Amino acid sequence: MHLSSLSLSLTALAIVSPSAAYPHLGSSQPVLHTNSDTTQSRADAIKAAFSHAWDGYLQYAFPHDELHPVSNGYGDSRNGWGASAVDALSTAVIMRNATIVNQILDHVAKIDYSKTNTTVSLFETTIRYLGGMLSGYDLLKGPVSDLVQDSSKIDVLLTQSKNLGDVLKFAFDTPSGVPYNNLNITSGGNDGAKTNGLAVTGTLALEWTRLSDLTGDTTYADLSQKAESYLLNPQPKSAEPFPGLVGSNINISNGQFTDAQVSWNGGDDSYYEYLIKMYVYDPKRFGLYKDRWVAAAQSTMQHLASHPSTRPDLTFLASYNNGTLGLSSQHLTCFDGGSFLLGGTVLNRTDFINFGLDLVSGCHDTYNSTLTGIGPESFSWDTSDIPSSQQSLYEKAGFYITSGAYILRPEVIESFYYAWRATGQETYREWIWSAFSAVNDYCRTDSGFSGLTDVNAANGGSRYDNQESFLFAEVMKYSYMAFAEDAAWQVQPGSGNQFVFNTEAHPVRVSST
C-alpha cells in the first residue's frame, strides 16, 4: 500500500490537508478524522482496560513480576523486582493516572536491584526496568511535571537507574566488551556463553547512553557503545552479505560474527530498530548508526522483500542464509513497518515510507484473516510446506500459521501507530481500534488479560495463564496514544521528535531537548 494509492472509506469523516503537519507527503493526501466524541470514548476505553489490568495485578500479584490472570496467581520471570509495575509507569504517566503513578514510584524506591534468586537477562532488564525508570524520569521532569507533587519521588527514578546500571555493568567485562546476557548478579558470574545475539548486543545503547547523559557519568554509554561498535563494523566481512545486513551471533571473546544469517525476526530485530532511533536521539553523535540503518533498509527492500504467490499484493520480509531465502516471519517482526516509517519521516524518504506502509499492510493481513482478528506468533508463505488443513487460508490470505499463539505482543499495533503518525490516515487508527478490541474481547479475564493458544480457533483456543508486563508498556500505550491528544512524547514528522521510544515503548527525551 503506497501513499499515492491509499483507498479509504470517507463515511462520516472530515477531510483536511496534511501538508502543514506532514509537508513531505504533499497536499494530495487527505488526513481523515473521526468524530471527536468517538476518539475520546476510545481513549477512555483503553484507559479503562489499562486500569482493569493494573487493578488485577495490584490485587493478586504485586509486587511480583506478573499476574497469572486465569488462576489469579503470580510469577517472577523478570528477577522478582516487580516488572509489571515498572513497565506500567510510563503508560500511567501518559494517561495521567496519578494514583497508579504514585503507587509505582513508592515501589521503585524499595527495589534492591542487587538481590534476586533468578538469572538476570541484561537485555530484558535494560529494556523493561532501566528503560521504564528513565522514561518515567524524563516524562515527570518534563512535559508531565505537574502530575507528582513530591519531586524527591521522581529523583528516585534516576538514583535507582544508576543503581541498576552499576549492578549490571559487570556484564561488559569481557575481552572484547561484547557483554554476556545471562547474569548471576550475586556472584558476578554468567552462563559461560561463547556468543551473544545481535539484538541482545545491539539493543542497549539507547538506555545506557541516556543514563550517562542524565548522570554525567560516561561509563554506561561507553560500555554499550563499545559493544555496538562490533556490529557497526562487522568482521569478518562475510558476516555482511548485503550492505547493512549482518549476521545473528557475535563471539564474546573477540567481537567477530560467527555467522551470516540475516533477518528482521526475533533475535535480530531490535538491532535494526535502534540504529535509526539512536540517530533520532542525537543526530550529531549517531550519524554512523543512521548510515548503517539506511544501508540495511535499502538492502532489505532489494533482497528480503517477498510476496506470497497467492497474494502478490502483500509484502513480508524473508530471512537469508547462504544464498537461500527463508519464507517465514513472526509477530515480533511486524515492528519492521514502524521502523521504516520512522526512518522515512525523519530522513524525508518517501521510498522508505511507502515500503513501511507495505509492511504494515502485510501485518494487518495476518490480523484480518484470523477468526479472532489477532495475528499469530509465527507464519509462513513457503509453498513447499503448506499443511493441507491451511491450504484455503493460504489461498485467501497469502500465509499459513506455524504457531497460532498470541502472548499479548504489541508489534502490529505499534506499526499501525507509526503509520497513523506518518500519514494521518484514519484507516490506521481504525486498524488499531480493531486490534485493541479483539484483544479486549478474547484475552480479557476477570483480573487482567491472558494469552491465547490459537488465534484462528473459536474463542482463541485455550488461555495462557500469564500476563506479560509489555501489555502495560506497549499494547496499552500504543493503542491509547493513537486516540490521545498530540503531546511532546508523540512521534512527530521530520526532525521534530522530542522523545524516542525504546523497544519496550518507553519514551525517553532526545538528547537535543
UniProtKB/Swiss-Prot annotation:
Sugar attachment sites: 97, 117, 184, 251, 322, 348, 368
Pathway: Protein modification; protein glycosylation
Catalysis performed (reactions): N(4)-(alpha-D-Man-(1->2)-alpha-D-Man-(1->2)-alpha-D-Man-(1->3)-[alpha-D-Man-(1->2)-alpha-D-Man-(1->3)-[alpha-D-Man-(1->2)-alpha-D-Man-(1->6)]-alpha-D-Man-(1->6)]-beta-D-Man-(1->4)-beta-D-GlcNAc-(1->4)-beta-D-GlcNAc)-L-asparaginyl-[protein] (N-glucan mannose isomer 9A1,2,3B1,2,3) + 4 H2O = N(4)-(alpha-D-Man-(1->3)-[alpha-D-Man-(1->3)-[alpha-D-Man-(1->6)]-alpha-D-Man-(1->6)]-beta-D-Man-(1->4)-beta-D-GlcNAc-(1->4)-beta-D-GlcNAc)-L-asparaginyl-[protein] (N-glucan mannose isomer 5A1,2) + 4 beta-D-mannose; N(4)-(alpha-D-Man-(1->2)-alpha-D-Man-(1->2)-alpha-D-Man-(1->3)-[alpha-D-Man-(1->3)-[alpha-D-Man-(1->2)-alpha-D-Man-(1->6)]-alpha-D-Man-(1->6)]-beta-D-Man-(1->4)-beta-D-GlcNAc-(1->4)-beta-D-GlcNAc)-L-asparaginyl-[protein] (N-glucan mannose isomer 8A1,2,3B1,3) + 3 H2O = N(4)-(alpha-D-Man-(1->3)-[alpha-D-Man-(1->3)-[alpha-D-Man-(1->6)]-alpha-D-Man-(1->6)]-beta-D-Man-(1->4)-beta-D-GlcNAc-(1->4)-beta-D-GlcNAc)-L-asparaginyl-[protein] (N-glucan mannose isomer 5A1,2) + 3 beta-D-mannose
GO MF annotation, one: mannosyl-oligosaccharide 1,2-alpha-mannosidase activity
Active-site residues per Swiss-Prot or TrEMBL entry: 377 (proton donor)
UniProt keyword annotations, A-Z: Carbohydrate metabolism, Cytoplasmic vesicle, Disulfide bond, Glycoprotein, Glycosidase, Hydrolase, Metal-binding, Signal
Primary subcellular site in the record, as a coarse category: cytoplasm
Name of the top EC class for this enzyme: hydrolase
Assembly and oligomerization: Monomer.
PANTHER family in UniProt: MANNOSYL-OLIGOSACCHARIDE ALPHA-1,2-MANNOSIDASE 1B (PTHR11742:SF101), MANNOSYL-OLIGOSACCHARIDE ALPHA-1,2-MANNOSIDASE-RELATED (PTHR11742)
Name of protein: Probable mannosyl-oligosaccharide alpha-1,2-mannosidase 1B
Organism this protein belongs to: Aspergillus niger (strain ATCC MYA-4892 / CBS 513.88 / FGSC A1513)
Gene: mns1B
